[in-house]
């Protein structure tokens, strides 16, 4: 872990079976560890967006973890800060799962202040289309994934 951790990412080329380093641009996240991630792809397959949520800097365990959401869009390798969170809602050491095309559930985790531990619930629902946490979860309500305008503004596309 270093302050430049997210500026360069490791990529595995399945065809040549080799690893290489790829530089990233945009709103590069600070150094983070113990975050969670999910992948959402454009309907036409033209871009793939890796959403990362939460985590902490890996050095100061007593510091507040992150509550921010970042998107790394491929193939442009551009970071976009999708959501700026709060210290009381933040968590690290949690897991994420994409239960529907437009929904990421974050499950569990921890916070340095046990009075704020997992504010909003043990499970929180982040909408990948609106880039907001939802107040409730209803498994009968979901939508197809649409690359958010915040991302297309920087990478192009529809």
State each model region's role:
Residues 2-17, 64-78, 118-134:
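Beta-propeller blade signature
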Residues 25-28, 59-63, 86-87:
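Juxtamembrane/interface segments of multi-pass membrane proteins
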Residues 46-49, 60-66, 79-81:
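Extended hydrophobic-aromatic, low-complexity segments
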Residues 43, 56-58, 110-112:
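Residue-level signature of beta-propeller blades and closely related beta-rich strand-turn architectures
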Residues 20-26, 80-85:
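A short beta-strand motif characteristic of beta-propeller blades
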Residues 1-3, 9-11, 25-52, 69-71, ...:
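Conserved short beta-strand element of beta-propeller blades
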Residues 99, 109-121, 133:
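CBM-like carbohydrate-recognition segments
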């Amino acid at each position: 872990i270093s302050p430049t951790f997210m500026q360069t990412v490791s990529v595995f080329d399945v065809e040549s079976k080799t690893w290489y380093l790829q530089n990233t641009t945009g709103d590069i996240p600070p150094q983070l560890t113990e975050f969670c991630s999910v992948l959402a792809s454009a309907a036409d397959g033209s871009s793939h967006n890796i959403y990362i949520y939460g985590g902490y800097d890996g050095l100061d365990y007593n510091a507040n973890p992150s509550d921010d959401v970042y998107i790394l869009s491929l193939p442009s390798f551009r970071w976009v800060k999708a959501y700026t969170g709060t210290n009381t809602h933040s968590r690290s050491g949690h897991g994420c799962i994409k239960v529907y095309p437009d929904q990421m559930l974050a499950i569990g985790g921890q916070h340095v202040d046990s009075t704020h531990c997992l504010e909003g619930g043990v499970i929180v629902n982040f909408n990948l289309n609106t880039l907001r946490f939802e107040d409730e979860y209803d498994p009968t309500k979901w939508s197809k994934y649409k690359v958010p305008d915040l991302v297309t503004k920087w990478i192009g596309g529809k």
